[in-house]
């Protein structure tokens, strides 16, 4: 078979398929059986579809075509959506009611149960294409935790109680909890299901605006309070530093004044001590040289008598001089009250120095 004949045959097949699709589906309507154990799609003629009450459920036994009027009969071959597009057709989905329990087909995920509920931001649960047909649904997915998203109507179908769990590679616990929740909500009414949609509850726009404004105001007040709180802390620390510095200055001033006082008192005591020593030296000092020499001899004699180990301890003369005089560096000093006063002065000086 040459190439020209093959191209002609392919074109003929495409034309035959297009014409068959057109003849089969023009002026006809697909209706889904609402039996939860069936959910098959049946093709109705335009006359039969006109008799369908959209407010009432429809089942397979209501089909006038005897070939497909039982739930046990398999579904008719349904063309791919791309084939319909090539012929200029498109699938139009009827709008599912709010609060419906649905099953969503997701890529790389098992069919996931959810509830049709309003988007709290848009305030609606369905969007339409330019022709006025259903395009997307807002769905809150079941499971722990809930999640929400806008899904194309192509991937949204009725939930069936006979659904068998599919293989789930990831989030197995999440998928299991979603199926359990779907079984629980299956017997609920549409209104009760909407109450379970915690992520999608409608809020008044004015109320939302007020909440946002209150939140912004609260944040401003919080930031303002934080600034006000920070300022006193800074000032308090600054004041503490100033007080500490002042205290140290006062303390240092007190220490200096105390030091000056001790030094002055010590100087006074030293002067008094010097006067006492001068008074103690007066009896031994004589104006003429002969007396000075004589005094020196006496002093030397006293030195020898005191330093000599041979001198008797019980000598009255030495005892008299020991009681009345004290020899320091060869100088004879008056004893008695003068020596006692000098000792007391030294004690006072020691006390002042220890205090300093």
Curated annotation (Swiss-Prot):
Keywords (alphabetical) are:
Metal-binding, Zinc, Zinc-finger
Q: Which residues bind Zn(2+)?
A: 33, 38, 60, 71
Q: Changing residue 30 to C/D/E/H/K/R: what effect?
A: Significantly reduced histone H3K4me3 binding
Superkingdom as given in the UniProt entry:
Eukaryota
UniProt-reported outcome of changing residue 30 to M: Loss of histone H3K4me3 binding
**Consequence of changing residue 30 to A/V/L/M/G/S/T/N/Q:** Reduced histone H3K4me3 binding
Q: Where does it sit, as one GO cellular component term? A: nucleus
What's the reported outcome of changing residue 41 to F? Significantly reduced histone H3K4me3 binding. Loss of histone H3K4me3 binding
Gene Ontology molecular function: histone H3K4me3 reader activity; methylated histone binding; zinc ion binding
Effect annotated for changing residue 30 to P: Loss of histone H3K4me3 binding
Q: Which Pfam families match?
A: PWWP, zf-CW
Query: Which residue numbers delimit the PWWP domain?
Result: 98-162
Region Disordered: which residues? 279-307
- Residue ranges annotated as zinc fingers (CW-type) are 24-79
Q: What is known of its domains?
A: The CW-TYPE zinc finger mediates its binding to trimethylated histone H3K4me3.
> What's this chain's function?
Histone methylation reader which binds to non-methylated (H3K4me0), monomethylated (H3K4me1), dimethylated (H3K4me2) and trimethylated (H3K4me3) 'Lys-4' on histone H3. The order of binding preference is H3K4me3 > H3K4me2 > H3K4me1 > H3K4me0.
Supply the name of the protein: Zinc finger CW-type PWWP domain protein 2
Q: What is the lineage of its organism?
A: Eukaryota, Metazoa, Chordata, Craniata, Vertebrata
Name the gene that codes for it: ZCWPW2
